[in-house]
Amino acid sequence: MPSRSPACRPRGRNRRSAADAVARPLALALILVSTLPRAAHSQDLALPPVQPRGVRRTMTCDNIPEPFGTRSRGASRLPGFEVTCGPNREAMLSIGGDAYMIDFVSVSGSYVVVFAEPITQVCYDGKGKPTPDTGTGAKSSEGTTTTFTWSLEGTPFTFSKSNKLVNFGCNRTLMANFFIVPGDSSPLYTSCTTTCNTLQISGSCLGEACCEAPMDQVNGAKAFSLSFERTTANGTGEEDGTCSAAFFLDKDETVFTFSGDEVRPLKTALLPPGERRMVLDWAIGSTSCEQTQSYTFEKLCKYGTCVDAPTGAGYLCKCPSGYDGNPYVSDGCQDINECRNYNSNNCTYQNLCNNTLGGYTCSCPENNIGDGYRTGTGCNTTLATPVSPSQQPQGINVCDHPEKNPCTYIKYCIDLEGVVSCACPEGMSGDGRKNGRGCCFSCQKHFPLDTVLGVSLVLMVTTTTAASCYCWAVKKRELGRKRAELFRKNGGLLLQQRFSTITSQGEDQYSSKIFSAEELKAATDNYSESRILGRGGQGTVYKGILPDQTVVAIKKSKVFDESQVEQFVNEIAILSQIDHPNVVKLLGCCLETQVPLLVYEFISNGTLFQHIHNRNATRPLTWEDCLRIAAETADALAYLHSASSIPIIHRDIKSSNILLDGNFVAKIADFGASRSVPFDQTHITTLIQGTIGYLDPEYFQSSQLTEKSDVYSFGVVLAELLTRQKPISAARPEDSCNLAMHLVVLFNKGRLLQEIEPHILAEAGEDQCYAVAELSVRCLNVKGEERPAMVVVASVLQELRRSFTIDQAVGIKDESIQENSEQEEKHLHESRSIPSLQSSEVSTQCSMEAKMSSFC
């Protein structure tokens, strides 16, 4: 019995009383079991293994039974029964070119349970358009009708009537024909139709978005064809994330992951495709035992007997009567001990059942008469005792002589030619004998030992199960209450209200989803270390896979300020409406955890920081990439500052917060430090937050956050792209460990070229490099009001992109780089025409940056 942990103990007097009510019978059961006679052998207590198909087992290549086999074990002796091994040694069965994981093989029942993909499955995207069919059925179309077929011809398998055909989706009709022989003119037909009134579904499959087509009449079918059509064209059920599917399912399995008392959205209702099991019957060959040559099945069934397959074609090997096991292997058939189980034998007294090889015998207690079998004469409690000739003189009736009479009551004695029977009067029980139990009105009833053991085990299992269920129910209720409290505390009700407002205003295409804690726990494999994408100052980011196979990034923050709940909810609602190609899309959040979780779209190609500073990258960034990434980032920031519904200041712009997708398109991420600015304000006052090296010195001094703080941080990113150096580096001299300050000083001295990455300078040319450097210096101005707006920065970068594209088109190439002294002299002259920072401004910036330079 599992120990009762403190976590599952109910709180309060009433709950403790309920727990005691469960625990007392359990204690009594344990006492009863501990007092049983120790003479009972452990093997007599063993219960036969019960393996319902509804419990997942998954066969491995090491325990797959004959007639199935692998090449490493000499393979199977029969065609079609060979299996292969998966990555984790799971047994895989090949049928028609597809591999199916084997869950269970029944030798005695001649069936195999496999995990099967849907016959057809179509899901819908955010615009209600169907995605490509992911089913395994062979597809063909004629007019408006689409047919899916599947044939098991040439294999030892047939479709089992232990399955059901499931039709899932809105307003769908499923019609299927099963053929005993492919092309049969009299197929077996089954069908069902679904309707839809809402996008919610209960745990039942009775026609509302789900129906089951029975297969009870399908026996021995080798092929089938299926049509799966819409019955209406109203579009219900074609919303983002919903699916329509038709699939086989073991009729012992449930269609859904929840009970019939719950109601859930359609998109989360189905079992995952890899969890659906179907049953296939199997048989050897296609002829009966009589039609098969005797030496063939004598060779295959030499450890058992041949019987015709119940599916109609082929034959099977069975163990002889009284034996059970695997008749396809040597010593596979083992004698059944019928005496262990009351239902396996026919004895009146179970303790007088004697097991024999291939059978058993029954007997009666001493001095009872009968054959001992329940369906025979049984055992008569009226005892028959033969009397020896010495006790019964010739012609004398023993019952007439009290000294010779063995019965308690003389008148209930019967002497039949020397055989004396004793009985008890009506209403009394016993054997009626003087030297036996006699006769009494309330004789103690003696139960056989196995009956006592059985009752004790049942009592113990029942009470243990009851206690476990009660504990589980208490834990589930406590967990639900805690999650509801966290949901309320984290602003869940307020956020639901905001999302409802957005939807009512016709902006639902931008609204996000509120995920449950269980959904995200499953998506991240319980927040496995292997799913971590990165760690930062704000928290940890995990890779998650939702039930519809959408890959997402889930951010788990370190801390959460409960006093800022309303502001957090407002910002979530705002971010959920941001629709810009260069901003990572917020898909939703979870408020049922101690710290809220944010769910973003997954960007696969890492961060700009990794691509800039990884010298061994397989595809280094070109100057064209750098210009485009910078322009895209600037355009996204300009959108956040001015074009979104409420201006948003990111507050932590840096190269590691700029993600790149597979085409190196920039995406701004990590809005954990972001703040929205009311339209009637130019700044907000807040605690200092950001990353050293990117942090605006003016914001650092005044705590006043403005849009120009993002401009400064973006200027540092431009400096990174030019120099390929990190914002803070101990490798540089102490007075220039800050890249921003270092770049400004070099620019004003006309010595910028010595810090620009050589291959960037060669590819971009001096004019482009100086133009970007000038823009970076303007962004790094110590006075925020003199920095350009992000709209201006984005415009300049777009113009530089066009200029670079034109230069490449006409084949203009930069001249060879001259001697460093000539370069410096030339650009010192050019820099006089470029507005530079005054020496006082540089000094001010240096003093501000000096406070942060200690971080070097």
Swiss-Prot record:
Mutation: residue 333 to A; reported impact is: Loss of cell signaling activity
What residue stretches are annotated with the EGF-like domain? Answer: 297-334, 335-380
Positions of ATP binding: 533-541, 555
**Which positions form S-S bridges?**
301-306, 319-333, 339-353, 347-362, 364-379
Per its UniProt record, what CDD domains does this chain match? EGF_CA (cd00054), STKc_IRAK (cd14066)
Q: Where is there biased composition of kind Basic and acidic residues?
A: 823-832
Q: Where is this region: Disordered?
A: 816-844
Q: Where is the signal peptide?
A: 1-42
Q: Which residues cross the membrane?
A: 452-470
Top-level EC class, please?
Answer: transferase
Keyword annotations for this protein, in alphabetical order, are:
ATP-binding, Calcium, Cell membrane, Disulfide bond, EGF-like domain, Glycoprotein, Kinase, Membrane, Nucleotide-binding, Receptor, Repeat, Serine/threonine-protein kinase, Signal, Transferase, Transmembrane, Transmembrane helix
Which Pfam families would you find in this protein's record? Pkinase
Active site residues of this protein: 652 (proton acceptor)
Q: Which GO terms describe its cellular component?
A: external side of plasma membrane; plasma membrane
Could you provide one GO biological process annotation from this protein's UniProt record? detection of symbiotic fungus
Gene Ontology MF terms in the entry: ATP binding; calcium ion binding; protein serine/threonine kinase activity
Q: Where is the composition biased (Polar residues)?
A: 833-844
Q: Which residues are glycosylated?
A: 171, 234, 346, 354, 380
User: Which PROSITE patterns does the record associate with it?
Assistant: ASX_HYDROXYL, EGF_3, EGF_CA, PROTEIN_KINASE_DOM, PROTEIN_KINASE_ST
Indicate the impact reported for residue 317 to A. Loss of cell signaling activity
Residue ranges of the Protein kinase domain?
Answer: 527-805
Question: What happens upon changing residue 652 to A?
Answer: Loss of cell signaling activity
Q: What is its EC number?
A: 2.7.11.1
| Name of this chain's protein | Wall-associated receptor kinase 17
User: What species does this protein belong to?
Assistant: Zea mays (Maize)
- Gene this chain is encoded by: WAK17
